[in-house]
């Protein structure tokens, strides 16, 4: 018998990857506006557990951010 006050535990729904799907944006090193959404206010790449980006797309995203930094499109450090 279940207790009267017992509740189901809360399960947070897993977010889906923003780069998968029909009309998802393409990861491009020239799209600095898109890349800035995945860089913290200190200039670090935000981990996928926070942004819910899949592992494959996170590697692509990190590569694009690093390429944009090298070409001067994104800053390495934001002060």
Curated annotation (Swiss-Prot):
Keywords: Ribonucleoprotein, Ribosomal protein, RNA-binding, rRNA-binding. Part of the 30S ribosomal subunit. Forms a tight heterodimer with protein bS6. It comes from the Bacteria. This is Small ribosomal subunit protein bS18. Both N-terminus methionine truncation and retention have been observed for this protein. May be methylated up to 6 times, on undetermined residues. It comes from Rhodopseudomonas palustris (strain ATCC BAA-98 / CGA009). The keyword Nuclease does not apply. GO terms for cellular component: cytosolic small ribosomal subunit. It holds the Pfam family Ribosomal_S18. Gene3D superfamilies: Ribosomal protein S18 (4.10.640.10). The keyword Thylakoid does not apply. GO terms for molecular function: small ribosomal subunit rRNA binding; structural constituent of ribosome. Belongs to the bacterial ribosomal protein bS18 family. One of its GO terms (biological process) is translation. Binds as a heterodimer with protein bS6 to the central domain of the 16S rRNA, where it helps stabilize the platform of the 30S subunit.
């Amino acid at each position: 018998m279940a207790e009267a006050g017992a509740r189901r535990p809360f399960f947070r729904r897993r977010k889906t990857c923003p780069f998968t799907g029909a009309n998802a944006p393409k990861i491009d090193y020239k799209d600095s506006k898109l890349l800035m959404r995945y860089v913290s206010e200190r200039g670090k790449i935000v981990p996928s557990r926070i942004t819910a980006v899949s592992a494959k797309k996170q590697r692509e995203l990190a590569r694009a951010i690093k390429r944009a930094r090298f070409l001067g499109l994104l800053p390495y450090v934001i002060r």
